[in-house]
Design a protein with these regions (language model features):
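Multi-pass membrane proteins that catalyze or facilitate reactions on polyprenyl-/lipid-phosphate substrates
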Residues: 1-265
Length: 265
């Protein structure tokens, strides 16, 4: 199979899975294994296509991101979504990521640990659906600092491969009385700085595996993940309010079974 086709397939996988509660890491490892695309070059490629997904969110939410530069609501203590909400949502994961980055990359990016993350994340999502209470926040402007911090703490779970950033944060939002749409949008926004920092750090360590010959493949993967991520996010927001998290949780368990059969055994 040609590199361009592999790039296209993995770009679709990344675009679909990055912001859905199904674990992009688990999917990329499984599909990469089935395609025979593994090793340091594959890891570097994954970093590049993650940047495509990040760009999709930056464009979709550019107005909201620009509004965060306005410090008036913060100074005047208005009940309006502001940069401090994002800080509270990002800070715990940044600390966890910096402290555990090398350990995670060295010991936790293993097939069996990803299976554990897939199942554990599914259990959390089902628990959040069962225990969720009537929402008190129906938009980002309704979000309290306490709810933002709660979601940020749940994002720490996503440093474990296979757990899923979206699954962790949306579950945390439901348990903190935030509705599906608001929890999802906040999840996307706080993912941006964390992902930019993590992918930037990884890219600094992996740039030596890049070569001029890789540019066409990496470009196809980047563009594909960008387009698919934009479509996936818009569709997911509409779908989540109708079906909730449980179908995604059941899919994760199914994926864990596939992972065990095709990668571990």
């Amino acid at each position: 199979m040609s590199d361009i086709i592999i790039a296209f397939i993995l770009g679709i996988v990344e675009g679909l899975a990055e912001f859905l509660p199904i674990s992009s890491t688990g999917h990329l490892i499984l599909v990469g294994h089935l395609l025979g695309f593994e090793g340091e070059r594959a890891k570097t490629f994954e970093i590049v296509i993650q940047l495509g997904a990040i760009l999709a969110i930056a464009i979709l939410y550019h107005k909201r991101l620009v509004s965060l530069c306005n410090i008036k609501p913060l100074i005047q203590k208005e009940k309006k979504f502001n940069a401090f909400h994002v800080f509270l949502g990002v800070f715990p994961a940044v600390v966890a990521g910096l402290l555990l980055h090398d350990i995670i990359k060295t010991y936790l990016f293993q097939p069996y640990t990803v299976v554990i993350g897939l199942v554990a994340g599914a259990i959390l999502m089902i628990f959040a659906e069962v225990k969720k209470k009537e929402a008190a926040a129906y938009s980002l402007d309704d979000l309290t600092y306490r709810q933002a911090l709660t979601i940020g703490l749940f994002q720490c779970l996503a440093v474990y491969p296979g757990f899923s950033r979206a699954g962790s944060t949306i579950s945390g939002g439901l348990l903190a009385k935030v509705n599906y749409k608001t929890a999802s949008e906040f999840s996307f926004l706080i993912a941006l700085p964390v992902m930019i920092g993590a992918t930037g750090l990884d890219l600094l360590k992996s740039w030596k595996y890049l070569s001029v010959d890789d540019i066409p493949m990496f470009a196809v993967g980047f563009i594909t993940s960008f387009i698919v991520a934009m479509l996936a996010v818009v569709t997911f927001l509409k779908l989540l309010e109708k079906i909730g998290l449980k179908p995604f949780a059941y899919y994760r368990i199914f994926l864990a079974i596939l992972f065990t059969l095709f990668v571990l055994l």
